[in-house]
């Protein structure tokens, strides 16, 4: 009889060890997903800084920001549209203002970059301007950028994203 109790005790110890290791793995893996999401959000911010610099160089060379070509409701999207190319990013690359294709790390309907050039008078802004947005971050963000006309606050159109606005 003592052998049976000893056997059961050893099995119980092993079971506790396996459960403990399983719990640690679950905690590690859930934290790992957060780390991956954070790194993708950091890349998104870095990409937008590169795109803003490239847009400024384009403006310096041509005296205006590039036009958007209405991939989707006036926006040029980093996901393209119906398999189309991303016009403003392609133009910046072709002109040598960026040296690689820039796209969101996930680059789908929820997570992408979008750009639109607006004319003077649109939404009450007196001069032409562009809006560049990160459509969404994976983690909540306190800094959502800036972009506003008298008739529309662009930051509110990408509530957990990031907005950049600049005027011609």
What are the residue ranges of the model-derived segments?
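N-terminal alpha-helical signal peptides/signal-anchor transmembrane segments
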Residues: 32-35, 47-65
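N-terminal Lys/Arg-rich, disordered targeting/topogenic segments
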Residues: 1-7
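Amphipathic alpha-helical segments typified by the pilin-like N-terminal helix
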Residues: 9-46
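Extracellular/periplasmic head regions of type IV pilus-like filament subunits
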Residues: 56, 60-136
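Short, surface-exposed interaction loops/tails
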Residues: 2, 123-168
């Amino acid at each position: 009889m003592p052998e049976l109790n000893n056997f059961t005790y050893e099995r119980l110890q092993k079971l506790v060890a396996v459960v403990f290791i399983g719990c640690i793995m679950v905690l590690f893996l859930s934290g790992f997903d957060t780390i991956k999401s954070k790194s993708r959000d950091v890349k998104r911010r870095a990409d937008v800084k590169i795109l803003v610099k490239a847009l400024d160089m384009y403006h310096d060379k041509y005296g205006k920001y590039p036009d958007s070509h209405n991939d989707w409701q006036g926006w040029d999207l980093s996901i393209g549209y119906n398999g189309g190319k991303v016009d403003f990013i392609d133009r910046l690359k072709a002109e040598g203002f960026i040296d690689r294709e820039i796209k969101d790390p996930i680059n789908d309907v929820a997570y992408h970059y979008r750009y639109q050039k607006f004319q003077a008078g649109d939404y009450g802004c007196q001069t032409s301007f562009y809006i560049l947005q990160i459509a969404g971050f994976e983690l909540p963000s306190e800094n959502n950028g800036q972009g506003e006309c008298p008739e529309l606050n662009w930051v509110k159109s990408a509530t957990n994203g990031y907005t950049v606005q600049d005027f011609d």
